[in-house]
């Protein structure tokens, strides 16, 4: 079976991690020309004011021709400190935050040079905490998307900012099922820190699921993704 092809992602979404939970291996695109305004360098968390986007400042060493593997991080502003403070403020009341916070903080404070290195470290952190056994490899060459897209090509579906969250051009099929392009994702509700204020917010960064459900998160991941 052909392994799914994904883009890299910063603090990847529940749907992203759900795909990994259902497969023995995936391939992550690194040879593409880096696209703007996607979840390759941003993540969504739930705060007391609603959904907050965490944006990672990046640098294109070769301008518009820079590949994803060449993208570096800018530390002109202390974004990593701001992100961590936002995460603490959002999840300090979550049941499992104290169990998982130290290692995540360490990764964010390491000042990685490349975006791909940061994302890879965060991805392996989540794989370990969710107890997901999925081998990660990276592309050697760029393969353009086909039309219609291959069922295993998820590079756009899982990281396009217009299709990740339920209020961004998605079609709601039921209370917890949403259609992203040709795929249907069912997001079983789980307790969240601010659910009495905003209701259930599906498909945030997977740290939302981790901090709220802890060791009970993996069964929910297995209910989230479609079978590819």
Show where each model-derived region lies.
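Residues lining hydrophobic/aromatic ligand-binding pockets adjacent to catalytic sites
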Residues: 1-228
């Amino acid at each position: 079976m052909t392994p799914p092809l994904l883009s890299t992602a910063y603090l990847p979404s529940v749907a992203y991690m759900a795909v990994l939970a259902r497969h023995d291996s995936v391939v992550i695109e690194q040879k593409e020309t880096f696209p703007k305004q996607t979840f390759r360098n941003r993540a969504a968390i739930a705060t007391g004011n609603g959904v907050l986007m965490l944006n990672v400042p990046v640098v294109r060493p070769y301008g518009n021709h820079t590949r994803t593997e060449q993208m570096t991080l800018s530390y002109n502003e202390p974004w990593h400190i701001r992100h961590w403070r936002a995460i603490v403020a959002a999840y300090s009341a979550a049941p499992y935050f104290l169990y998982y916070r130290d290692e995540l903080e360490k990764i964010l404070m390491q000042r990685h040079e490349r975006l791909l290195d940061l994302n890879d470290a965060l991805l392996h952190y989540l794989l370990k905490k969710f107890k997901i056994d999925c081998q990660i490899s990276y592309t050697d060459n760029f393969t353009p998307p086909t039309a219609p897209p291959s069922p295993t090509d998820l590079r756009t579906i899982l990281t396009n900012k217009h299709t990740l969250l339920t209020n961004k051009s998605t079609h709601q099929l039921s209370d917890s099922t949403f259609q992203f392009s040709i795929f249907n994702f069912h997001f079983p509700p789980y307790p969240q820190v601010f659910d009495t204020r905003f209701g259930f917010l599906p498909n945030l960064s997977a740290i939302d699921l981790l901090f709220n459900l802890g060791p009970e998160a993996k069964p929910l991941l297995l209910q989230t993704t479609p079978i590819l």
